[in-house]
Regions:
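Short amphipathic C-terminal alpha-helix that caps PH/PH-like domains
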Residues: 97-109
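Catalytic beta-strand/loop cores that center a nucleophilic Ser/Cys/Thr
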Residues: 1-96, 113-130
Length: 130
């Protein structure tokens, strides 16, 4: 339809999720998300169970309309896993929004509220981890 390759058109942030309890956000990306998402990697999730809803969901172009995510949680191999596909190392001392998101995630995964409900096969995780 367009003269350029299809691309994503934004993110849907599930701000009501407890992972964001200590990170101010709306249901869409605001200014604080620029630094966080600048070097993020999108995970193709169309083969995952329908019930798995990424807490940071990438909105694909209408040409493709695939399920994409940057952050999600699941049960894998009897354990609990939270995946966040963003750069968490580069110049972190200069990135207050990223630090605050990581602090919120850390508090969440250490709490009793971290209880993923959807089971994923380990092969899915291996498909995007190098």
């Amino acid at each position: 339809m367009f003269a350029w390759a299809p691309m994503t058109i934004g993110c849907l942030i599930h701000a009501d999720e407890p992972v964001f309890a200590d990170f101010p956000t709306s249901y869409h990306t605001d200014w604080q998300w620029w630094d966080i998402l600048e070097n993020a990697k999108v995970i193709e999730m169309q083969e995952t169970p329908r019930e798995l809803r990424p807490f940071i969901q990438v909105i694909d172009s209408f040409d493709n309309n695939e399920k994409l995510g940057i952050g999600f949680e699941a049960r894998v191999g009897g354990g609990r896993l939270l995946v966040l596909a963003v750069d968490t190392r580069k110049k972190l001392d200069e990135r207050p929004a990223t630090r605050q998101l990581l602090e919120s995630i850390d508090k969440y995964v250490r709490s009793d509220r971290f209880d993923p409900q959807v089971e994923l096969d380990e092969s899915f995780i291996r498909s995007f981890v190098r």
